[in-house]
């Protein structure tokens, strides 16, 4: 029996044997193919260097094998085993090369097809521009007709509030009410002032309904009738006085209210200006009277100092003093003005003045 010089269990297993034990893994194969393709595309120089190193390693291994063959004669069985191993390695290398070539062929075959498949889609996208749908413009709608109706209330119950009036009409089925306008009652100057009562009373008013029909029916049914309600109510015995205003709109009412308000303000403005003028005239008179009183006092003091009135004159002197004072009040005050030195009335020869003026002007110009 021949003894085994190599221990198969202690030797390092080759990569080919490991691959045969693991079996075929498609994911791993695809990863390895991808890695090989990437290396060939990007790192060509590194691959060349690695090939040179592998060739150099193979040459060294061949030299070592030759020296061993020369030194030790081996049996036929060992030589046949090694030859078989080398054949297997060559076949494995050929298989790997074939796989790489097939991968390259498949990538080359798939790339034009993919480019063709992608190109029509891109061309279709570019050739078909996005069509913007034109939205139809909104048709110009005609303005809605104003179908509101307005009624006029010539008189209102005392201390009736606007929301109470609205609730009264709506409870009787006349609605919907859109707007209510009541004019406050202006108290007359002769009427006594009531400071304790803070409630307001209104003279007349206007009520706008959403439809003309309800306004007409309301005016026809409630006009000249009592307000009604609870028997002991505050407004039970008061009478409605209302009229439907044909062709009258709320805008017309606002114009009328504004016009009346402007007229009222204009009258008040005129009255204010008139009152200011009267006050101004009165103050001027008061000031003038004070001035005259001061003048009288000064004149009396001067007369007393001079001693014009003697002790034996009696009643005649007193009457004369009163008459003099009355005459002084009526006399206008005169102020002495300064005279012009070279007036025309004082210049005798006007021609000489004109000659002098001409001479001076001729020198200047």
Swiss-Prot record:
Residues 111-129 have a biased composition (Low complexity). Transmembrane segments: none annotated. Keywords: Nucleus, Ribosome biogenesis, RNA-binding, rRNA processing. The keyword Nucleus applies. One of its GO terms (molecular function) is RNA binding. The keyword Magnesium does not apply. Gene3D superfamilies: 3.30.70.330. Residues 149-239 form the RRM domain. One of its GO terms (biological process) is endonucleolytic cleavage in ITS1 to separate SSU-rRNA from 5.8S rRNA and LSU-rRNA from tricistronic rRNA transcript (SSU-rRNA, 5.8S rRNA, LSU-rRNA). Signal peptide: none annotated. Belongs to the ESF2/ABP1 family. This is Pre-rRNA-processing protein esf2. It comes from Neosartorya fischeri (strain ATCC 1020 / DSM 3700 / CBS 544.65 / FGSC A1164 / JCM 1740 / NRRL 181 / WB 181).
């Amino acid at each position: 029996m021949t003894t085994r010089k190599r221990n198969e269990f202690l030797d390092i297993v080759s990569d080919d044997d490991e691959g045969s034990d693991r079996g075929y893994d498609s994911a791993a194969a695809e990863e390895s193919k991808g890695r090989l393709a990437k290396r060939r595309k990007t790192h060509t120089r590194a691959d060349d260097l690695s090939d040179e190193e592998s060739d150099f390693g193979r040459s060294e291994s061949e030299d070592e094998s030759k020296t061993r063959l020369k030194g030790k004669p081996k049996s036929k069985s060992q030589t046949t085993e090694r030859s078989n191993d080398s054949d297997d390695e060559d076949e494995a290398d050929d298989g790997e090369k074939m796989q790489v070539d097939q991968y390259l062929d498949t990538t080359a075959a798939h790339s034009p097809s993919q480019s063709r498949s992608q190109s029509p889609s891109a061309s279709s996208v570019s050739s078909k521009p996005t069509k913007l749908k034109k939205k139809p413009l909104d048709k110009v709608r005609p303005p809605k007709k104003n179908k509101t109706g307005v009624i006029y209330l010539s008189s209102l119950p005392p201390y009736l509030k606007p929301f109470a009036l609205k609730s009264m009409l709506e409870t009787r089925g006349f609605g919907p009410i859109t707007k209510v306008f009541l004019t406050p009652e202006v108290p007359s100057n002769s009427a006594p002032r009531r400071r304790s009562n803070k409630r307001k009373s209104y003279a007349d008013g206007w009520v706008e309904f959403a439809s003309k029909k309800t306004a007409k029916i309301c005016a026809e049914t409630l006009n000249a009738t009592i307000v009604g309600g609870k028997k002991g109510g505050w407004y039970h015995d008061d009478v409605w006085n209302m009229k439907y205003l044909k062709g009258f709109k709320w805008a017309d009412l606002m114009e009328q209210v504004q016009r009346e308000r402007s007229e009222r303000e204009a009258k008040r403005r005129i009255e204010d200006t008139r009152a200011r003028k009267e006050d101004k005239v009165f103050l001027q008179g008061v000031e003038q009277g004070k001035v005259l009183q001061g003048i009288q006092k000064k004149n009396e003091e001067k007369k007393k100092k001079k001693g014009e009135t003697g002790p034996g004159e009696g009643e005649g002197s007193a009457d004369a003093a009163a008459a003099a004072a009355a005459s002084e009040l009526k006399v206008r005050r005169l102020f002495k003005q300064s005279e012009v030195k070279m007036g025309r009335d004082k210049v005798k020869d006007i021609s000489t003045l004109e000659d002098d003026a001409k001479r001076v002007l001729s020198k200047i110009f």
